[in-house]
């Protein structure tokens, strides 16, 4: 394979979702084994909100929530912070390689309000459940934490309500029709594409250099950034978005991304299991009403906003300004949750047990239960897809006729 063939096939074209999500599952497994924590983003975004408040004299470090997730240090001294910086760098490099960066403004104020309000709801719900589509779902279920299953089911339900809500007439933006005499060909500016590809390579190797230099003195921080670059490349090139996995299932019947996510978790689970058997402590959270309520809010919020925590990150660096607002909403929502945490934490979270399936059913039993639940989820998704298109077929035939 020549360089030009490799460049076009792997650096410019989008990647197939299933192999990319499986790769993300494998990468997240090694990330857990090396750093001792799971792939997650909203906890760090919450710390950003807390530290912004500190700049204005607010003693956020005294809040109970920040005593749990720790507010010490800065993004440059925390594993999650370095990983997220790596993710942004990886996303941006991948977008530049494909010349997929263009400033795109929201078409209406309604979309901006959707982004901010949906982002706030999603951020609040994610931190209420102690995790977003990553820590309380994609990387939470392979940790064998029961709370992640509560969150996943609630998120699916919340996304159904979100899908129905966003189909209301108020969210329909008028489309401006323009008469044309012929289709406009899709074109790119070759010089611009070359410049951006080189800039993407500069950013990519710059991030790698930064990570390796950091790893010389602080191995976990440097490796966290390397993993972040990998995660960023995967989510941007494969356009991995958990919002579309849920929303598309309800609205269009498409389940390709949802099935990819299930398979990715199945691949990750056995790897996490092996690390746990070697003595690494899994990340188990409270299996209380917080997981259910947080999932409902998160599922509704991501569909209203149009993007989840990973989805808004790669779209933001592609120049889609709508997702800048979603990200801002996420930080605001998670910070609001941190402020009110002490008021309802005992009733909704901390008085409830942290249930580890590997301890409840034994190591092999917990692994088997997890795979049975994943298989059940996959069968339900396939069943829903068949039912959706079976019901849609008569209507489609009627419209064609």
What are these regions (language model features)?
Residues 1-401:
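Membrane-interfacial helix-loop segments of redox and metal-homeostasis proteins
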């Amino acid at each position: 394979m020549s360089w030009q063939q490799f460049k076009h096939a792997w650096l410019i074209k989008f990647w197939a979702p299933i192999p990319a999500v499986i790769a993300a599952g494998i990468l997240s497994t090694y990330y857990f084994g090396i750093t001792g924590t799971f792939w997650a983003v909203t906890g760090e975004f919450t710390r950003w909100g807390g530290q912004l408040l500190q700049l204005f004299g607010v003693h956020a470090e005294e809040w109970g929530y920040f005593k749990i997730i720790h507010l010490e240090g800065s993004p440059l001294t925390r594993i999650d912070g370095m990983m997220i910086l790596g993710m942004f760098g990886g996303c941006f490099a991948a977008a530049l390689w494909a010349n997929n960066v263009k400033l795109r403004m929201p078409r209406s104020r309604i979309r901006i309000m959707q982004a901010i309000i949906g982002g706030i709801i999603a951020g609040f719900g994610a931190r209420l459940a102690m995790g977003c589509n990553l820590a309380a779902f994609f990387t939470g279920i392979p940790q064998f934490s029961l709370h992640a299953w509560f969150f996943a089911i609630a998120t699916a339900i919340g996304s159904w309500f979100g899908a129905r809500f966003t189909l209301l007439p108020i969210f329909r933006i008028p489309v401006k029709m323009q008469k044309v005499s012929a289709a406009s060909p899709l074109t790119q500016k070759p010089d611009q594409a070359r410049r951006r590809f080189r800039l993407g390579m500069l950013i990519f190797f710059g991030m790698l250099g930064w990570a390796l230099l950091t790893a010389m003195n602080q191995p976990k921080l440097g490796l966290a950034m390397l993993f972040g670059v990998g995660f960023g490349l995967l989510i941007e090139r494969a356009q991995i978005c958990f919002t579309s996995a849920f929303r598309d299932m309800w609205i269009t019947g498409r389940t390709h991304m949802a099935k990819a996510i299930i398979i990715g978790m199945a691949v990750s689970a056995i790897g996490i299991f092996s690390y746990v058997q070697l003595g690494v402590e899994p990340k188990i959270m409270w299996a209380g009403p917080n997981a259910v309520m947080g999932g409902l809010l998160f599922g509704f919020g991501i569909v209203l906003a149009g993007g989840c925590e990973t989805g808004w990150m790669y779209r933001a660096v592609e120049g889609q300004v709508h997702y800048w607002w979603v990200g801002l909403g996420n930080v605001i929502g998670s910070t609001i949750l941190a402020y009110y945490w002490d008021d309802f934490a005992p009733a909704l979270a901390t008085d409830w047990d942290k249930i580890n399936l590997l301890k409840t059913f034994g190591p092999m039993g917990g692994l088997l239960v997890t795979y049975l639940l994943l298989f059940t989820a996959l069968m339900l998704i396939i069943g829903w897809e068949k039912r959706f298109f079976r019901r849609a077929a008569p209507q489609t035939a009627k419209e064609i006729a």
